[in-house]
């Protein structure tokens, strides 16, 4: 599986994508704290 950030993983062999919500909520929280300026 490939990890794309924000809790998102994709499995190319099996053609499915899933989200690790523990990771996602932490990373989204960091983005919120840092603001959207970096993007």
UniProtKB/Swiss-Prot annotation:
Gene3D superfamilies: 1.20.5.130. Thermostable, activity is retained after incubation at 100 degrees Celsius for 15 minutes. Keywords: Antibiotic, Antimicrobial, Bacteriocin, Secreted. Stable from pH 3.0-9.0, inactivated at pH 10.0. Its main location: secreted. It is found in: Secreted. InterPro entries: Bacteriocin_IIa, Bacteriocin_IIa_dom_sf. GO terms for biological process: defense response to bacterium; killing of cells of another organism. It comes from the Bacteria. One of its GO terms (cellular component) is extracellular region. Antimicrobial activity is lost upon treatment with beta-chymotrypsin, proteinase K and papain, but not when treated with lysozyme or lipase. Bacteriocin with antibacterial activity against C.jejuni. Belongs to the bacteriocin class IIA/YGNGV family. This is Bacteriocin SRCAM 602.
């Amino acid at each position: 599986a490939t990890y794309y950030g924000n809790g998102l993983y994709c499995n190319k062999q099996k053609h499915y994508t899933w989200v690790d919500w523990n990771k996602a909520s932490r990373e989204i929280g960091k983005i919120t704290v840092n603001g959207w300026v970096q993007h």
